[in-house]
Swiss-Prot record:
Enzymatic reactions: putrescine(in) + H(+)(in) = putrescine(out) + H(+)(out); putrescine(in) + L-ornithine(out) = putrescine(out) + L-ornithine(in)
Keywords: Amino-acid transport, Antiport, Cell inner membrane, Cell membrane, Membrane, Symport, Transmembrane, Transmembrane helix, Transport
Protein name: Putrescine transporter PotE
Subcellular location(s) of the protein: Cell inner membrane
Membrane topology reported for the UniProt record: Multi-pass membrane protein
Similarity comment: Belongs to the amino acid-polyamine-organocation (APC) superfamily. Basic amino acid/polyamine antiporter (APA) (TC 2.A.3.2) family.
Gene Ontology, cellular component aspect: plasma membrane
Length: 435
């Protein structure tokens, strides 16, 4: 009885799933979407359907998979150890890239907060400083940084949800309509350009079932919570980014490095805008703090499985994989310098497109393996058919996201993938030689 009383219900899990999905990915999106116009609402709708399908399929993976290693374990059902390696490798690389983009977001809001104009090199150097600061603070272990991250996430959620509710008072319908497609880009192309950015806001949906053990009747309630949480996050994302487009003129929004702060300044005054910018910087850094530790843990787990070099699994007395953290941040430093662009927004866009491409690869591997996973675990026929169909929708969306990311991101993403196959060749003897 006491064990049951400690379980959470479907409504609580739905809210928890939604909150976990809403991170710092949203804070730069109004700027990127303003470059395309308010036609990007169609991209949001496409991504909402695709992301919900992926999240539901991942919830089923988590419910029924008997293999460890997250997406790598799912992929192993169809693709063996090579698939496990590639899923974990591309996922790890995507997190390295994504965290660099999060650091750039923090720098963008920080520069607006303090009223400074940064050169391309200065942006890179401040990004590097932010990454190293987050890494060093993680040397003390996960508990402190976990507590900080769970608090600072509200620095994003409160303004985003707030503007979704009260922003309509300042919404100008004619401004929104005039911003529909300011550059007269063909409709299909305009929708495609925005897909990477809208999917960026949902990265992390693969962990939607992480709280399955804490819920009553998980087989029934987890899929409901995942669907509800993903759709709830989608509604807030769509409403918040679109209401801003009716508050701030399109050109001004497209050139901003702190769009939510700018919107609140338009709604109230500069002081309120600065407060929102401060909250966003705090939240961004808190998110970065948590994700820097998470990346090191992903690499550590892969090293323990024998996929990555052994030094990634070395830990200190405080259970912090410090050597791995330093190595990862060194790679991020190099990435920050390699992607220096004429503006902060351009550098952010390059990193987001590449992060999405590398993150979608383990999504595709997991979706493709789901049919075998469900058969191996003797899932009921009707549930099997429904889940495989939903996974197919998720796969179609993932392939479209790859196409929409553009030639440059696909080129670099392909190189990253081919490097992965090469690296697997050096460790495959541990798994593929017949004993």
């Amino acid at each position: 009885m006491s064990a049951k009383s400690n379980k959470i219900g479907v409504v609580q899990l739905t809210i928890l799933t939604m909150v976990n999905m809403m991170g710092s990915g949203i804070i730069m999106l109004p700027t990127k979407l303003a470059e395309i116009g308010t036609i990007s609402i169609v991209s949001w709708l496409v991504t909402a359907v695709g992301s919900t399908a992926l999240a539901y399929a991942f919830a089923q993976c988590g419910m029924f998979s008997k293999k460890s290693g997250g997406m790598g374990g799912y992929a192993e059902y169809s693709f063996g150890k090579a698939g496990n390696f590639m899923a974990n490798y591309t996922y790890g690389v995507s997190l390295v890239i994504a965290n660099t983009a999060i650091a750039i977001s923090a720098v963008g809001y920080g520069s607006e907060l303090f009223g400074t104009i940064l050169s391309p090199l200065s942006i890179a150097l401040w990004t590097i400083f932010t990454l190293w600061l987050a890494t060093v603070l993680n040397f003390g272990g996960a508990r402190i940084t976990g507590n900080i991250s769970s608090f600072t996430i509200w620095g994003v959620i409160i303004p985003v949800v707030g503007i979704s509710i009260i922003g309509w008072k300042w919404f100008d319908g004619s401004m929104y309509v005039n911003s529909w497609n300011p550059h007269n880009v063909p409709t299909f192309e305009a929708i495609g350009v925005s897909i990477s950015m809208t999917l960026w806001a949902f990265l992390g949906l693969e962990s939607a079932c992480a709280n399955a053990d804490a819920v009553e009747n998980p087989e029934k309630n987890v899929p409901i919570a995942v669907l509800g949480g993903t759709l709830g996050a989608a509604v807030i994302y769509i409403v918040s980014t679109n209401v801003i487009a009716g508050i701030v003129p399109n050109l001004e929004l497209a050139n901003s490095t702190a769009p939510f702060g700018l919107a609140f300044a338009h709604m109230f005054d500069e002081t309120v805008g600065k407060v929102i910018m401060g909250l966003m910087v705090m939240s961004c850094f808190g998110s970065l703090l948590g994700w820097q530790f998470t990346i090191a843990q992903v690499f550590k787990s892969s090293a323990e499985e024998g996929y990555f070099p052994a030094f990634f699994k070395k830990i200190t007395s405080k259970d912090a994989p410090v050597v791995g953290m330093i190595t990862i941040t060194a790679l991020q430093t190099l990435l920050s310098l390699m992607t220096i662009s004429p503006s902060l927004n351009k550098q952010f866009n390059v990193l987001v497109d590449l992060a999405v491409v590398t993150n979608v690869i383990p999504y595709l591997l997991s979706m493709a393996a789901l049919a075998v996973l469900l058969k191996a675990e003797n899932v009921a026929p009707q549930k099997y058919k429904t889940t495989v169909f939903v996974a197919f929708i998720g796969s179609l969306y993932s392939i479209y996201a790859l196409y929409a990311a553009g030639e440059q991101a696909m080129l670099y993403g392909s190189i990253v993938t081919f490097i992965g196959w090469t690296l697997y060749g050096f460790v495959s003897y541990k798994f593929d030689l017949k004993k």
